[in-house]
Swiss-Prot record:
Its main location: membrane. GO terms for biological process: Gram-negative-bacterium-type cell outer membrane assembly; lipopolysaccharide transport. Together with LptE, is involved in the assembly of lipopolysaccharide (LPS) at the surface of the outer membrane. This is LPS-assembly protein LptD. It comes from the Bacteria. Residues 1-18 form the signal peptide. GO terms for cellular component: cell outer membrane; transporter complex. InterPro entries: LipoPS_assembly_LptD, LptD, LptD_C, OstA-like_N.
């Protein structure tokens, strides 16, 4: 079992680009850390008509000596601009421009409040030294003690023999002690030398140098290190370094030493390009992975970019590459999750006008663990035109696509495809229904190259397919009563007739085409396959209806849909042209349900049932109990037959049941857990259990996970059998709150831990 203890001391801000608008959620719990207030401050604030450079002194008693020294006593208030000093006694040397004060001393300006035993201030330079000080940063939870506190002329703080915390006074949950701390008020950042972290008054960590934020402002420097140990990776030490290059650029470099694997480095560079574009680069590298017998180098490259060039042009790019199929399984990448098995590489530029648009795209998809590689789109050009209300009744659309398919393996054939689709639509809209008539002409031209001599493919193919579609829907409504409650019920039947002409397409290769799902909304599609390499002939009716229940406040309480296709003729087109399908008179019966059963109980489900064979093609159901936003209990089941196992190329049935919960044990203590079980294999495939305690200044999370791993064949291991089938681990996270952008751990991210992330399954219109 993998055992991992992770100490995440999140003294770090949520690093964002400075020019990028952000919102920071307020912590759910905040410590009340209030600095002391002197009555003399209120007396000073009551005075008006005083400029910032004038000095105001208020006291019960005063005297002036022959040597230009003035002495004040009894509730002394000394003010200049935004700086205020309250004390029992004060001496002002006008010649030396020096002020000394003691006795119940309080210093305050716009950034911090300090109490101290003594104060010595140089008014000409705005420097001040306070001894025996306690300090509070305004607008933050940060406060602490210092043997000596110096305020510089530019309003920075220099603290000697000091400490700080974000917990309330008297709460020693955590405390950071240091020989010296410098707080830059302009940069809103702190530098710390020779720091010692105490948790529950026990020293747990020594740090010779570190930087921390005192606000959300970013600054170059080392971020707080993280430490972990595991039986898989050994001892891990990560020390991120953040470089604030410019307002529009920043970089984070994270060396992560793993005793079982070696030095793993992660670099992230982010940028803003103008006002409407942004992107980032990621480079991750592990040299000579000592965990593998081959000691192979492992790496990742990633680039993403998106935005608008002007009001018409949009651009987007995304590229990721890894060294091996199991990169995400073995390493904690910042780019993808361990369950991701596809890397999409895409570059796209689009131009938009009111009546037309144009798009250019190149795409390559890398599928991890599969020997057969998909075709590359190099490139694809799309042009679309639309004109509404021709003769005040008819809409005209013209869609076109020119695609060049290439393959990394030279043994595969390649192709260029031109697809043109003019269409006429006659929509009729009424207050209680609609009827749409549509005709299309699908004209496609293929030029195929590198064809084997024994292949059935042709060099040049022209395909012309007519299509007609009629779709009508009526909305009925009535008042009804259910369980002594008044509701408004709708009945929304719809019917569609679809005709698609037949043409033999066995001489066309498969480049980007796959079977589409037959859910309820898919029954009313005009196509059976994605892509354009196969256009299934059709002569069919689709019947379906949806019914809804609305309460008296117009909140949707139930939605149920069911539908089925009736085939007038058998389709003669399939992806596998050698496979003869069994003639069926109907499609699957597809039904979907979303309902609020009672107060806090919700159910959601779908089924695809073959009425001719009596078998279910797919079904899933979830039952949710949500009495409040932080309380959840979810039961789920899903069944999918004949799913392809990419490792073995076998067909497998998926039959899985699960339970997921999030529940507060007390005001500060939460429990999150999930459990998923494979009914066919009779085994646990995932367990996650976590408890989290959160106070106003710190949070602690302890969690355990056990889950099946998705391992792939690759060149780095002799066989897939040598890899662990399951992964388990224990995690301990400790988070400090109240500094900069640091906030609560939150429960939502715990719900999303694991293979089966939580998703709210309800689609009621509320």
């Amino acid at each position: 079992m993998q055992i991992r203890y992770f100490l995440a001391l999140s003294l770090l801000p949520n690093i964002v680009l400075a020019d990028e608008p952000t919102t920071t959620e307020a912590p759910s719990l905040q410590c009340v850390v209030a600095p002391p207030v002197s009555r003399s401050f209120e007396d000073r604030e009551a005075l008006t008509g005083i400029s910032d450079d004038q000095i105001v002194i208020i006291s019960d008693h005063s005297s002036v000596a022959y040597n230009n020294q003035a002495e004040f006593s009894g509730d002394v208030s000394f003010s200049q601009g935004l700086r205020h000093i309250a004390a029992d006694n004060a001496v002002l040397d006008q010649k030396e421009q020096r002020l000394n004060a003691d006795g119940n001393l309080i210093f305050k300006d716009e950034l911090f409040t300090v109490t101290a035993d003594t104060l010595e201030a140089q008014m000409s330079t705005n420097n001040a030294t306070l001894k025996g000080a306690q300090y509070w940063l305004h607008g933050q939870q940060v406060h602490g003690d210092a043997e000596k506190l110096q305020i510089t002329s530019d309003n920075n703080l220099l603290l000697t023999k000091t400490n700080f915390t974000t917990c309330p006074p008297g709460d020693e949950s955590w405390l950071l002690e240091a020989d010296m701390i410098k707080i830059d008020s302009k940069e809103e950042w702190g530098e710390i030398w020779n720091a010692k972290l105490r948790i529950a008054n026990i020293p747990v960590l020594y740090i010779p140098y570190m930087t921390v934020p005192v606000s959300d402002k970013r600054k170059t420097g080392f971020l707080f290190p993280s430490f972990s140990t595991s039986t898989t990776n050994g001892v891990e030490v990560s020390t991120p370094y953040y470089w604030n290059i410019a307002p529009e650029f920043d970089l984070t470099f994270t060396p992560d030493f793993m005793s079982s694997r070696g030095l793993y480095t992660k670099t992230e560079f982010r940028y803003l390009a103008g006002e409407q574009q942004n992107g980032q680069f990621n480079v991750e590298y592990l040299g000579s992975d000592s965990k593998l017998t081959s000691n192979a180098d492992r790496y990742l490259y990633h680039w993403s970019h998106q935005g608008a060039v002007n009001k018409n042009w949009r651009v987007r790019s995304d590229y990721t590459d890894v060294s091996d199929n199991n990169y995400f399984n073995d390493l904690n990448s910042d780019v993808n999750q361990s369950t991701d098995n596809q890397l999409s590489r895409i570059g796209e530029a689009s131009y938009f006008e009111r009546d037309w648009d144009f798009n250019m795209r190149v795409q390559d998809i890398k599928v991890l663990g599969e020997d057969e590689k998909p075709y590359q789109v190099m490139p694809q050009l799309n042009f679309n035109y639309r004109s509404a209300d021709i003769f005040n009744t008819i809409d005209f659309k013209f869609n076109s696509e020119l695609t060049n398919f290439r393959h990394q393996d030279n043994e595969y054939n390649t192709a260029t495809r031109l697809h043109l689709v003019p269409s006429l639509i006659w929509p009729i809209q009424g207050p209680a229904g609609s009827f749409t008539s549509e005709v299309k002409l699908l004209q496609t031209q293929y030029w195929q190259q590198n064809i084997d001599e024994d292949s059935t493919l042709n060099d040049s193919i022209s395909r012309t397919i007519p299509q007609a579609r009629l779709h009508g829907q009526v909305n009925f409504e009535r008042a009804t009563q259910l369980f002594d409650e008044q509701y408004r019920q709708t009945l929304e039947p719809q019917i569609q007739y679809l005709y698609v002409g037949y043409e033999d397409q066995s001489n066309i290769g498969i480049y980007d085409t796959a079977q589409l799902q037959e859910d309820y909304y898919g029954l009313f599609r005009d196509r059976q396959y994605s892509g354009l390499d196969r256009v299934a002939d059709a002569n069919q009716f689709t019947l379906g209806f949806t019914t809804r229940l609305f309460d008296q406040t117009n909140r949707e309480k139930l939605k149920f849909s069911v539908g089925q296709i009736m085939y007038l003729e058998d389709s003669k087109v399939s992806i596998d042209d050698t496979y003869e399908e069994t003639a069926q008179s109907t499609s699957v019966l597809a039904a979907e349900l979303d309902a609020q059963l009672y107060n806090d109980w919700f159910v959601s489900g779908s089924v695809q049932h073959d009425t001719e064979t009596g078998e279910n093609k797919k079904n899933e159901v979830t039952l949710d109990y949500r009495p409040s936003s932080d309380r959840l209990l979810q039961l789920s089941y899903r069944y999918v037959p004949d799913l392809l196992n990419t490792n073995t190329n076998d067909q497998v049935d998926i039959s899985q049941a699960g339970v997921r919960t999030s529940w507060p044990i007390s005001d500060n203590l939460y429990f999150v857990g999930n459990y998923y079980y494979d009914l066919n294999e009779s085994r646990n495939i995932e367990t996650y259990t976590g408890v989290q305690y959160e106070s106003c200044c710190w949070a602690l999370r302890l969690s355990y996970h056990y889950r099946i791993k998705t391992n792939y064949d690759d060149d780095l291991s002799e066989s897939i059998d040598g890899r662990e089938e399951f992964e388990s681990g224990v995690y301990l996270n400790f988070v400090i709150k109240g500094l900069g952008g640091s906030g609560p751990l939150g429960v939502d991210d715990m719900l999303n831990e694991g293979l089966f992330n939580y998703r709210k399954p309800l689609y009621l219109r509320n």
